[in-house]
Regions:
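Generic structural hydrophobic/aromatic packing signal, biased to beta-strands
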Residues: 1, 5-7, 62, 130, ...
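Acidic low-complexity segments
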Residues: 2-105
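Weak global preference for isoleucine
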Residues: 3-7, 59, 75, 134, ...
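A mature extracytoplasmic/lumenal domain signature
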Residues: 9, 132-134, 168
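Active-site rim recognition segments
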Residues: 28-41, 49, 81, 126, ...
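Short C-terminal domain-edge/linker segments immediately following a structured domain
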Residues: 53-57, 111-114, 183-187
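Active-site neighborhood of thiol-dependent amide/isopeptide-bond enzymes
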Residues: 68-151, 172-175
Length: 188
């Protein structure tokens, strides 16, 4: 059964493209998703309440963050590094902010880092979702050696979901995380 999806994303030239088709181009326009049908990945490229890919500020950030990179893993790493540096006020005072809100306030905790990173990935053609679980941190909130609740981003690259954690500054992350659930943050 064909599913029609409208996706806005940045072209490699930095222009906004809208596509409307039963299949969605994944990995920056490369249709090779190693056995996963593009329509199975459509949900991870679509906009939603948390990731408005028509937002001019997000489009600008996605273009700047990508810097012309096309190779999916290198692109994911560039985006992760960008978000790590872009969110300048690291705190727990923000609720679960949308990517558009984070783009403007530049503040938040792991959830804001994760949502912004997923949005920038989608705008650059990387299927993106968030993972929720716990992560080991050596020091947090005055405590040493703890596992704390955490949220990070996953990009679908070369036939698998790869962890990218802008809050903890890691790409293709070390095994300090335990995933409880994953989500596209699709509207309910």
């Amino acid at each position: 059964q064909a599913v029609e999806v409208v996706v806005s994303r940045l072209s490699h030239a930095g222009n906004v493209q809208k596509s409307q088709s039963p299949r969605v181009q994944a990995n920056g326009g490369n249709a090779d998703t190693n056995g996963k049908k593009n329509d199975e990945l459509a949900e991870y490229l679509e906009p939603n309440l948390m990731m408005n890919n028509a937002d001019a500020k997000l489009i600008e950030l996605a273009r700047d963050a990508a810097g012309g990179e096309r190779e999916p893993y290198a692109l994911g790493d560039r985006l992760r590094r960008f978000v790590t540096d872009y969110v300048t006020t690291k705190n727990l005072n923000v609720g679960f902010a949308t990517a558009s809100e984070v783009a403007r306030t530049r503040e938040g905790d792991c959830s804001e880092h994760g949502v912004l990173l997923a949005a920038l990935g989608r705008l650059n053609g990387l299927p993106s979702r968030v993972a929720v679980g716990i992560a080991y941190v050596p020091v947090f909130g005055g405590q040493d050696d703890i596992f704390g609740y955490h949220l990070w981003t996953q990009f679908y690259i070369d036939g698998r979901w790869v962890d990218f954690d802008a809050a903890l500054r890691e790409s293709d992350c070390s095994p300090i995380r335990i995933t409880f659930a994953v989500s596209s943050l699709k509207n309910s």
